[in-house]
């Protein structure tokens, strides 16, 4: 008896890529024109015109390498876009200029000292652009022949490469044959071979072989057959940070320590040797220093020892631009009894350029909510948008933005194509803001644990 075999095609499931939306994922730059004038709404940045222009001037100086070893302080109330400005600076600088983000509380660790943690952050924010000339063989593979010995122990072969102008046959050893097999190089592929290291890079498939197969994978890339000589000299530029050079030279396992993350304390003598070697490369024209940016958020959480270290470290020859952010007013310097603006000692404040941020107006708040809703794929009705903007003024911008996702979910539950006022009101009813939560804490203070304070006789009572 024949088995019943289903001939229906199997159903294919769409696997959607999960994309996390960050708090600042809508920011793509500072939103300035060529004259460093802030646009009203550009690259995800709204308002804060003076602060954005000041940040643009600083970035221009960073790109020209003229402002290393300086300190900038972004001071302003919470929810005024200090971290957003730092993210915009990251996007504007690009990947070639090192940008290190650090929260002040990350400095305190049981494994390494505070000064070592700050030193590593400083060294990560300094890039070294190393130039080297390499000889490359680039061409289209015509034929690969592999000859095996009778015993099968050794392999030899020949590789035929061509450009539009010439064709050459190269003899191959066993290691090169293994490399070709590892990269799955076939006739018709365009390859690049580094003569010094023997590394083979597969650039793509030649346009001339585009019709060899009826179906090809999505990752198949077609490139033109190279022209001119097969052997060319190219200048390759690598950008690494000083910290990466420190780690590679401090451990026996070398660069593997970079991936392990367990760098530990690095000796000052080793750093001095590396600084000397980098200075030697600069004199020979082999390398150049790329001063980056170190951003320290919540800087008031650092203590007096960290601040005294920063005083000295910023005057070092190899120092990045240090950007700090604080939302404190006159507050106590951690580790002392003294108060100071922003919780930073006066001698360090004197070395800083201070950028102040102000609270957003209602129109700016509305535009920010609109951009965030678009980023989160939420359709807001005009009335809901106005309500969220008003909430942002009365409570805080973060609370208003945090209500977008719950409101959208409530709208989906009632099968509505867009989020309306009633959804926002329902979310407002479910989730308290800071003021309502504080009011609730006061009303229920008798049932909640509070702080205790000592009175006569050392007896403790509820505050």
Curated annotation (Swiss-Prot):
Key words, A-Z: Activator, ATP-binding, Chromatin regulator, DNA damage, DNA repair, Helicase, Hydrolase, Nucleotide-binding, Nucleus, rRNA processing, Transcription, Transcription regulation
Top-level EC class as recorded in UniProt: hydrolase
Name this polypeptide is given: RuvB-like helicase 2
Organism per entry: Cryptococcus neoformans var. neoformans serotype D (strain JEC21 / ATCC MYA-565)
Protein role: DNA helicase which participates in several chromatin remodeling complexes, including the SWR1 and the INO80 complexes. The SWR1 complex mediates the ATP-dependent exchange of histone H2A for the H2A variant HZT1 leading to transcriptional regulation of selected genes by chromatin remodeling. The INO80 complex remodels chromatin by shifting nucleosomes and is involved in DNA repair. Also involved in pre-rRNA processing.
UniProt subunit comment: May form heterododecamers with RVB1. Component of the SWR1 chromatin remodeling complex, the INO80 chromatin remodeling complex, and of the R2TP complex.
EC identifiers of the protein: 3.6.4.12
Record has Transcription regulation as a keyword: yes
Subcellular location as annotated: Nucleus
InterPro entries tied to this protein: AAA+_ATPase, P-loop_NTPase, RuvB-like, RuvB-like_C, RuvBL1/2_DNA/RNA_bd_dom, TIP49_P-loop
GO biological process: box C/D snoRNP assembly; chromatin remodeling; DNA repair; regulation of transcription by RNA polymerase II; rRNA processing
Pfam families, A to Z: TIP49 (PF06068), TIP49_C (PF17856)
Family classification: Belongs to the RuvB family.
Domain of life: Eukaryota
Entry's Gene Ontology cellular component terms: Ino80 complex; NuA4 histone acetyltransferase complex; R2TP complex; Swr1 complex
Coiled coil: none
Gene Ontology molecular function: any one: ATP binding
Catalysed reactions listed for this entry: ATP + H2O = ADP + phosphate + H(+)
Binding site for ATP: 76-83
